[in-house]
């Protein structure tokens, strides 16, 4: 059986206090930049922007972030303002678990004052998030059995 592995790192916005976690991506700031500004900026940077109707988000493919190559980077909006930036990787092998562990350790080191909280912790699905009061950084993966 083929395995589908998804690793996803998402940055999302919750309005509260001062942000410590990175909140700017591709020249766009969470909670500030409008949808039009994000799309215009991505076009200027030479990205081909696609829209996913099912998930109601825009995305670009084949990007590098945090020293890793990602299949996609998605952008979600709330009230026409950038609210989430997510990085995803699809793979048919479990090397993604190593990438997840590496990214999790990097975030724990970089944001040591923010406690990570596991919301899912089993062999096929892990999700940990860090919340500084404004920005939520979540790191996770999901392994699905395929045909």
Residue locations for each model-derived region?
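Sec-dependent N-terminal signal peptides
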Residues: 4-15
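Short amphipathic alpha-helical segments, especially helix-boundary/capping motifs
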Residues: 16, 80-84
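Non-cytosolic coordination micro-motifs
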Residues: 20-57, 84-147
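N-terminal, post-signal-peptide region of Sec/Tat-exported proteins
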Residues: 42-79
